[in-house]
Every structure is written in C-alpha cells, then in structure tokens.
Design a protein with these regions (language model features):
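UBC/E2-like fold recognition across ubiquitin and ubiquitin-like conjugation systems
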Residues: 1-92, 101-190
C-alpha cells in the first residue's frame, strides 16, 4: 500500500487548500509551515471535510489533537472534557479514532486511550466502548462529530461510576479491535 501522507517544510504566506483531480494540499502557516499532501479518494475527502469542520467548529468540550492528524489522517486523537454538572466534570479523556478505506460505509474503530479511561457501565477498562452506533447501528450519515456527541451524552447521563459487570473477563479475552466484538445492547438506563 502506498503511503498517502507526506510532510514537507515550506514557507506558505497563509492557510490555504489547493486541490487537483488527484491530490489535495493543505497548507497551514500557523502549524510549523508544513504541507500535508493527500491523494484524493472519496473516503479521504470525507475525512478531510469532517476534520476541517471539527477543527473550525468543534462541539463544546471536544477538540482534535491536530498533531496526531498531521502525522496520519487515518488515526485521530480527539480530546473530550467531562461536561459541567456531571459525574465527569473537570475530567479530560482521549479517544482514538481509526479509519479504513471503507469509511464512511464502515464505522471507525473508536476507543478511549491514555491514563484516564472513564469508569462507566459501558466503557471497559481497556478503553473499549459498548455503543451501538460504533457497530450494528452505524450509518454513513453519522460522523466523527456525531460519535463524539453520543459519547459525551453517554458520559453526561451516567448516574454511577462503575465498570461493566463483565469487565474482568472481557478485558482478558477480547479482541484488540472492539469492532470484532459481538456486543449485546441491553442497558440504556445509565
């Protein structure tokens, strides 16, 4: 597979996007004068569009780690803050989104990463999230932003910080990719 992401140092005069039939160049003067050159395929164009939207107008408490995205368009780190007035107020979390070339027809792989994995009845201690829109209920109409809002809402509605009852056995026996898990969605009351 070809490496579709290359970085070059140059001196741009301002932020701009230059497109041709096969390549997009995103040039940002504010970010170390780097150029991001990407081959244009449908899934990459969709990711670029979602990324620009999320950077320009992020939902409250959600921010893209732009350094992670500049390294690899197929893996995004998203920072999420606990909503004020909830059990997670003042806490900071990180989500890792992994995309494949079937996106948006195939859902991204989404997990919590880092030292602070939320203690929640639908979040396992390894960062896997039991949320139907990440697997069975995924639709190409959904986006990274809608996933972030769903996860933020899931955290905000939680009434008790506790792990799923099967956390211990699941973490020991699960696949590394949570999308390969056959989830049973039986509890929407947390």
């Amino acid at each position: 597979m070809f490496n579709r992401l290359r970085m070059r140092k140059e001196k741009p005069s301002k932020s701009e996007t230059i497109s041709t039939a096969t390549t997009t160049v995103i040039q940002d003067a504010a970010k170390d004068n780097k150029k991001l050159i990407l081959d244009n395929s449908r899934w990459e164009r969709r990711l670029q569009k979602e990324l620009m939207s999320l950077i320009k107008e992020p939902p409250p408490g959600v921010a893209v780690d732009e350094d992670s995205v500049s390294q690899n368009l197929t893996q995004w780190i998203i920072n999420i803050d606990g909503v004020e007035g909830t059990l997670y107020e003042g806490e900071h979390f990180q989500l890792l989104f992994k995309f494949n070339n079937k996106y948006p027809f195939d859902s991204p792989e989404v997990t919590f990463i880092g030292a602070n994995i939320p203690v929640h009845p639908h979040i396992y201690s390894n960062g896997h999230i039991c949320l139907s829109i990440l697997t069975d209920d995924w639709s190409p109409a959904l986006s990274v932003q809608s996933v972030c809002l769903s996860i933020s809402s899931m955290l905000s509605s939680c009434r008790e910080k506790r792990r799923p009852p099967d956390n211990g056995i699941y973490v020991k026996t699960c696949n590394k990719n949570p999308k390969k898990t056959k989830w049973w969605y039986h509890d929407d009351s947390v």
